Amino acid sequence: MRGGVAVSSGAMFTGTAVFDLLLPGDSRSLKAKRSYVRPIVAALRRFEVSAAEVGALDLHGRAEIGVAVVAAEAAHVREVLDSCERLVAARPEVELLSVRRRLYGVDDD
């Protein structure tokens, strides 16, 4: 107890995923690219994750979307990242080329 407030030493896990996407051939401008990326980012945010376009910013035919989630249990982080990956993979307008995932615990540097 610190200053009359109970302090928890609970665990915290952070998970990240970066989705590398191939956009359709008609994505020849940044405006067209945004028309594909924005709905995917909005759909990902329904999983209560932070989501943003994080790479390939100047490439019209590619996009990288990153997500991050924090939870008290590693299993929950994995479940949320799995759900995000399924959502992106199921989008018929883009092709999911690769996924890079990381899970960090409180003891990771």
Predicted feature residues:
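Short beta-strand/turn micro-motifs at beta-sheet edges
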Residues: 2-10, 51-57
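Short, flexible turn/loop "capping" segments at secondary-structure junctions
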Residues: 10-16, 58-62
